[in-house]
Structure formats: C-alpha cells, structure tokens
C-alpha cells in the first residue's frame, strides 16, 4: 500500500517535507495558493535583500574618494532594480518547481 501525503503550503517547510516524503516513497501533492517557493520568501525576503545590496553598493561608492579614487554619482535605476528582483524571483520559483517535479511531487 502506498502512502499518500498532501502538504498545504509550498514554502521552504512544505518543500522540505515533500522532498523527504517523496524520498521515503510516498505519493506527495503540494497545495500552494500563491507562489511555489513561499510568498513571504519570494515577495519579501528576496526583494528586500536585493534592495539592501543595491543601497550598500551606492554607499560604498561614497567611500571611494577617501581611498584616492575618483568619485562618480551613483543613481539607482528603480526600473532596472525591479526587473532584477523579478528575474531572481522567477528563477527561484522555476528552480523549486523543477526540483519538486523531478522527484515526482504533484503541485
């Protein structure tokens, strides 16, 4: 008899549970209402870290003058930053989906 398992939530916890259950031979289905990989992770954590990194890079350029380097004004291209964040989010969601699919986990 095959063990069947339904996991509600496709975030990091649900994905880990699904992966382990599949490795142990269970038929696994993940139910996710939003974004596979976790809405909080992909909509909050990733974008905020990308924005922090960009701000840090701008801040670092302000210290260049003290190191004998010519300083140029760095401006944040908000549209470019948003596109970068969206690309990261899409790649992570696709990678998560492909990994789960490769293990026979239904979504």
Sequence positions of predicted segments:
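Beta1/beta-strand and adjacent pyrophosphate-binding region of the FAD-binding site
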Residues: 1-13
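Glycine-rich flavin
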Residues: 2, 19-26, 31-107
């Amino acid at each position: 008899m095959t063990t069947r398992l339904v996991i509600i939530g496709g975030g990091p916890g649900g994905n880990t549970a699904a992966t382990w259950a599949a490795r142990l031979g269970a038929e696994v289905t993940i139910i996710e209402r939003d974004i596979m990989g976790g809405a909080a992770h992909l909509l909050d954590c990733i974008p905020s870290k990308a924005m922090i990194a960009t701000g840090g890079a701008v801040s670092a350029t302000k210290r260049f003058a003290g190191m004998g380097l010519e300083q140029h004004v760095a401006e944040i291209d908000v549209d470019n930053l948003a596109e970068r964040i969206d690309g990261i989010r899409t790649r992570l969601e696709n990678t998560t989906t492909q990994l789960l699919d490769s293990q026979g986990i239904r979504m």
